[in-house]
């Protein structure tokens, strides 16, 4: 919407205009025609191979060489570059610039197009935190997949804990369930921590898994002073020294994000399980870029690549974020989820976008004619964290303090006695100290 109407209009309109307005021709007959009398709600498969499917949303990621004025001492994305060359890849059209992570996420997970919502709206905040909705999680669960979401930042940001529950995930592991030891100079968790938790998600079930990972390392703001003492990659070409410092910081975060991507692929290769991994950037970084700065001359493009170990044909094309889930599922012979089925069947047909708006309205704001009284999800069932947090022992120390022993504690763990929060000190993942609590 911002690219259509501009910032001033969208900002003011976002205060009053949310949701999808009812289309003029919205009625039961129209929806039944669009969905072939509800056939699009069915789940079918025409392929015996059901791999693990991992989506990795890389915070503020794009290929820095797309910024034409920037010179770097070496390629900041050698692992992803190799993937670009050998696997399906291209530009990834996203709904926002410099911010709006949750909106790209929304399009990827639901297949819905943000264009039909209010300008500047976040459906996570306005709709999905209070209403269940089918998504990639429910689509994959229809085939028996375990479904997991991961994020190395706070679980309540963008109401993710509520949203992921409402769209059908089995589990959500946020930073509150991670022992994060490494952070950027700006204080964001480094992405390498996600490897352990992706492995835990895959190990938590006997069947195939859909794992949706949201990274945070590349997050702004980007420091305008030099904060990395000995950067792996040096940068020149930005218009000012301050901008150059910001770009150098960003490029070095991207380099480490690329190392994370390479390590994830290596981990999946070593597991030996059939697997597809999709990497993509959620939006461009907040660097004040203009269209003329970019090779693509477009500010809503990031990059994506689809790595696999099952022999998928390389097929390069540019794709909007709301279509990628349907594309990946189609390549695997999986047809599930009303909106994803719609994309697979109708993308090249007349009135594709017009009918998509009608379908989105019916599912989120209308009478849900598409489900004929049988929606694919009626309530959430999600648990926070993959591994159970347990308390196994309470020990009184000689100084009349107490030590709690258990498993999977983190620095975010809180201790309550009779519903009263206690002062506590996290020592490690098996021990927490209570310096001032009275238990007698």
Which residue stretches match the model-derived regions?
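Alpha-helix initiation and N-capping motif
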Residues: 4-9, 23-28, 77, 102-105, ...
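Transmembrane and membrane-interface helices of multi-pass
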Residues: 1-3, 439
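Helix-hairpin-helix/helix-loop-helix acidic hairpins
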Residues: 6-48
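Solvent-exposed soluble domains appended to multi-pass membrane proteins
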Residues: 38-50, 58, 63-433, 440
């Amino acid at each position: 919407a911002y690219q259509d109407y501009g910032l001033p209009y969208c900002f003011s309109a976002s205060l009053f205009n949310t949701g999808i307005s009812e289309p003029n021709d919205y009625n039961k007959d129209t929806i039944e025609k669009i969905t072939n009398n509800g056939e699009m709600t069915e789940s079918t498969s025409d392929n015996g191979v059901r791999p693990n499917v991992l989506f990795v949303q890389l915070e503020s990621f794009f290929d820095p060489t797309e910024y034409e004025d920037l010179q770097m001492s070496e390629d900041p994305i050698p692992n992803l570059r190799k993937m670009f060359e050998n696997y399906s890849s291209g530009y990834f059209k996203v709904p926002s610039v410099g911010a709006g992570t949750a909106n790209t996420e929304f399009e990827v997970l639901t297949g819905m197009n943000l264009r039909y919502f209010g300008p500047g709206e976040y459906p996570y905040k306005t709709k999905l935190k209070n209403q269940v909705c089918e998504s990639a999680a429910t689509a994959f669960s229809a085939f028996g997949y375990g479904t997991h979401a991961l994020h190395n930042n706070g679980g309540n940001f963008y109401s993710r804990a509520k949203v992921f529950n409402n769209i059908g995930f089995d589990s959500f592991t946020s930073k509150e369930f991670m022992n994060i030891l490494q952070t950027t100079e700006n204080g964001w968790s480094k992405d390498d921590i996600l490897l352990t938790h992706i492995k835990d998600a895959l190990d938590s079930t006997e069947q195939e898994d859909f794992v949706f990972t949201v990274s945070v390392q590349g997050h702004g703001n980007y420091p305008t002073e030099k904060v990395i003492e000995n950067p792996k990659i040096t940068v020149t070409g930005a218009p000012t020294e301050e901008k150059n410092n910001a770009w150098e910081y960003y490029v070095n975060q991207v380099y480490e994000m690329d190392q994370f991507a390479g390590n994830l692929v290596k981990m999946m290769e070593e597991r030996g399980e059939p697997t597809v991994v999709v990497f993509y950037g959620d939006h461009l970084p907040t660097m004040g870029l203009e269209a003329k700065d970019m090779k693509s001359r477009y500010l809503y493009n990031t990059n994506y690549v689809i790595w696999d170990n099952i022999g998928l044909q390389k097929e390069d094309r540019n794709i909007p974020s709301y279509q990628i889930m349907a594309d990946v599922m189609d390549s695997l012979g999986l047809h599930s989820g009303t909106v994803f089925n719609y994309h697979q069947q109708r993308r090249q047909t007349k009135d594709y976008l017009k009918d998509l708006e009608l379908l989105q309205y019916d599912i989120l704001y209308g009478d849900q004619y598409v489900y004929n009284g049988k929606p694919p999800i009626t309530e959430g069932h999600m648990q926070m964290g993959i591994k159970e947090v347990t308390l196994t022992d309470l020990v009184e120390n000689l100084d009349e303090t107490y030590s709690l022993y258990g498993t999977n504690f983190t620095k975010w763990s809180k201790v309550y006695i009779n519903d009263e929060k206690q002062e506590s000190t996290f020592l490690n993942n098996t021990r927490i100290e209570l310096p001032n609590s009275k238990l007698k």
